[in-house]
Amino acid sequence: MSWQEKINAALDARRAADALRRRYPVAQGAGRWLVADDRQYLNFSSNDYLGLSHHPQIIRAWQQGAEQFGVGSGGSGHVSGYSVAHQALEEELAEWLGYSRALLFISGFAANQAVIAAMMAKEDRIVADRLSHASLLEAASLSPSQLRRFVHNDVTHLARLLASPCPGQQLVVTEGVFSMDGDSAPLAEIQQVTQQHNGWLMVDDAHGTGVIGEQGRGSCWLQKVKPELLVVTFGKGFGVSGAAVLCSSTVADYLLQFARHLIYNTSMPPAQAQALRASLAVIRRDEGDARREKLVSLIARFRAGVQDLPFTLADSCSAIQPLIVGDNSRALQLAEKLRQQGCWVTAIRPPTVPAGTARLRLTLTAAHEMQDIDRLLEVLHGNG
């Protein structure tokens, strides 16, 4: 089989399964409205959970940062790309979340890959929730360490895996809020069993940070858990992009020496760091509380109105509200029907989710209004 035949076969298989991914060029993709092909849609696909991507103070902070620092960082943080803006953001994040140190990364994917690659050796073991994000599972699969997966949120199964002999160290990996189901991990129970077996806990709280807990401190703070490694990302609740790893001072020093994604990547622009500082300020103040409270009300309105639909509604109290349809083609058809009625919704299919669980991944944000939720419910009930 030639290269071209190999590529064609893979694409043909995706098409045959109604699983071929595609991109849509949009004129505006975050916030309440999505604009594509000169048409405006109510946007139920954005991860901009607090509606901060268009916040004027955050936009102005980025503009002022670009005027002060330029539009790029100029290099790796180990060379010339670590600015006073990066330093200030790291210090503010560490203070906010109660850690000694924070290290910035260009993306959550990079942060997860970097930590696992740097921390794990052949004699070690990673024990990961089966539904962990692709960045975590890919990094674990590529690691020389052993990978074992526990049944989603099943602490008993986790304990059984941790109890089997391991010559090295054990790292338990999970998410705070799961990206495709919107449910939360029982972090207190997971931490307890991890500590009983002398392991470390790594939590990716991409979808909880900024959105839940006191001052938006996220899933771990809400459940009174402090993992050894906490990954937070800035493309969701913060409305920007990038990520950070929160950890002890010695672990931060270690990652600065051995995390290749940190050493060899160009740092995020200092202007971006300034925007993130402005976003953090909004998240922590009363305005952040008001946005979180509004989001909770919108979620409650949606869940109350969707109960009698012929789909499985995931057990989620988060901004992620999946309607599990099952069949790929049915999910695509329903997403298209919603778009025709002015609601932009994304169909998520295998391999992103398990076979037979294709779904509409609906996301609600504080930028929505109650009438937006009512319109979505009207269309879902076939009355659009």
Swiss-Prot record:
Enzyme class: transferase
Entry's EC annotation: 2.3.1.47
Obligatory cofactor(s): pyridoxal 5'-phosphate
Top-level taxon: Bacteria
UniProt-listed GO biological process terms: biotin biosynthetic process
Binding site for pyridoxal 5'-phosphate: 108-109, 179, 207, 233
Keywords (A to Z) from UniProt: Biotin biosynthesis, Pyridoxal phosphate, Transferase
Entry-annotated residues carrying N6-(pyridoxal phosphate)lysine: 236
Reaction it catalyzes: 6-carboxyhexanoyl-[ACP] + L-alanine + H(+) = (8S)-8-amino-7-oxononanoate + holo-[ACP] + CO2
Binding site for substrate: 21, 133, 352
InterPro entries found in the cross-reference section: Aminotrans_II_pyridoxalP_BS (IPR001917), Aminotransferase_I/II_large (IPR004839), AON_synthase_class-II (IPR050087), AONS_Archaea/Proteobacteria (IPR004723), AONS_Proteobacteria (IPR022834), PyrdxlP-dep_Trfase (IPR015424), PyrdxlP-dep_Trfase_major (IPR015421), PyrdxlP-dep_Trfase_small (IPR015422)
Pathway note: Cofactor biosynthesis; biotin biosynthesis
UniProt-recorded Gene Ontology molecular function terms: 8-amino-7-oxononanoate synthase activity; pyridoxal phosphate binding
Physiological role: Catalyzes the decarboxylative condensation of pimeloyl-[acyl-carrier protein] and L-alanine to produce 8-amino-7-oxononanoate (AON), [acyl-carrier protein], and carbon dioxide.
Protein family membership: Belongs to the class-II pyridoxal-phosphate-dependent aminotransferase family. BioF subfamily.
HAMAP family noted in UniProt: BioF_aminotrans_2 (MF_01693)
Subunit structure: Homodimer.
NCBIfam families to which the protein is assigned, alphabetical: bioF
Descriptive protein name: 8-amino-7-oxononanoate synthase
Organism: Shigella boydii serotype 18 (strain CDC 3083-94 / BS512)
